[in-house]
Amino acid sequence: MSQLKEIQEEITRHEQQIVIARQKLKDVEKTVEADPDDVNKSTLQSRRAAVSALEDKLADFKRQLADLVSSQKMGEKPVDPTGLEPDDHLKERSSLRYGNVLDVNAIDIDEPSGQTADWFSIGQYITGFALAIILKALYMLSTRGRQTIKENKGTRIRFKDDSSYEEINGIRRPKHLYVSMPTAQSTMKADELTPGRFRTIVCGLFPAQIMYRNIISPVMGVIGFSFFVKDWPEKIEEFLIKPCPFLKKSGPSKEEDFLVSNDAYLLGREKALRESHLAEIDDLIDLAASGDPTPPDSIKSPQAPWVFACRPDRCPPTCIYIAGMAELGAFFSILQDMRNTIMASKTVGTAEEKLKKKSSFYQSYLRRTQSMGIQLDQRIILLFMTEWGSDIVNHFHLGDDMDPELRTLAQSLIDQKVKEISNQEPLKI
């Protein structure tokens, strides 16, 4: 009953506030009619927003009251001796107990979860902002991503920065960058920004700026990304001139050497990708070419690997038709799975890392990238792994275990002290 009383009091209080707010709104409307300057117009907008917010809150409290009264009535109904709910269609009770009621009112079946994003609309939205707020938001959603997402789950957050503003009637106002933080039950619109879509589009549009500022996601940092991208132009050039095991050599000549090189294989891959083009992604690439963005034009570009520095969950659409780029992202995903498997096999590592015995970065990346209309060439991933796999695995950050002699000495000191102060068995360090 106390909860019912609290809701009724809130309804009464909000009704009183609405009466006052509506009166203030009428007064401002009269003032604007008499003197329609910018200050009065701004006040009018804020009064309207205040009334709207109060009406929304009142409607919410009335819904809560209706739900509470309904649940109390249900509780007062006599319990069926069979244990069946009154609207259950079964004649005899199931062996399963009744679980939670899942409210699906908020779900829009015309916009099902997991649909392909509208990358052109998202790209247009992002390129309308100053670079400073974009990179700061990227930092918050990559380098500090886990904490930001955890604190704001289930809400639509706004990023604000002095570099991002718009002028309306001569008044400068903040231009917020909106990003949705969905839960597992959320349904996303095609043009709605989520952390994954944001990282994907920004990494694809501004890799040179990310490289210059050295913005790297922790997930990429621990697989040795900084080591891998060092001297990238030389590294990729060495890879491209090597003979490809999937192309057969017919005779000794310089021209023949090129025709059986990894470079020739990637050229063949690029021809195959031309048949997979989607108009929406082509429009996005044209949009990027006409403005400030710096997407790579080839896998040889110095900024090419930096497309994946903030761990986008798929290959960014701006470079999906560049031979080898989607496969390079898949290579990084496999490295993340490999490191997680190593961490799960060790005695060190966080509890979360030990739980990740089945890591699925690669499967997730593959599924999301292929939803954009291309099939990955796994032979290119194999070439990358053969060329660089051994070297980069040696640069994984694995959280060094304690030296055996140091562990033995520390344990002996623990045992000695515990015996002095307690009769309990000492724990192992």
UniProtKB/Swiss-Prot annotation:
Q: Name one GO cellular component term.
A: host cell Golgi apparatus
Q: Which GO terms describe its molecular function?
A: endonuclease activity; RNA binding
The segment annotated Interaction with host DAXX runs over 373-429
List all disulphide bridges recorded for this chain. none
Q: Where does motif YxxL map?
A: 178-181
Q: Which residues form a coiled coil?
A: 4-71
Region entry Interaction with host UBE2I/UBC9, spans? 188-191
- Where are the stretches annotated Interaction with glycoprotein N? 80-248
Alphabetically ordered keywords of this record: Chaperone, Coiled coil, Endonuclease, Host cytoplasm, Host Golgi apparatus, Hydrolase, Nuclease, Ribonucleoprotein, RNA-binding, Viral nucleoprotein, Virion
> Which protein family is named in the record?
Belongs to the hantavirus nucleocapsid protein family.
As for what it does, the entry says: Encapsidates the genome protecting it from nucleases. The encapsidated genomic RNA is termed the nucleocapsid (NC) and serves as template for transcription and replication. The nucleocapsid has a left-handed helical structure. As a trimer, specifically binds and acts as a chaperone to unwind the panhandle structure formed by the viral RNA (vRNA) termini. Involved in the transcription and replication initiation of vRNA by mediating primer annealing. Plays a role in cap snatching by sequestering capped RNAs in P bodies for use by the viral RdRp during transcription initiation.
Record-given protein name:
Nucleoprotein
Q: Which organism is it from?
A: Tula orthohantavirus
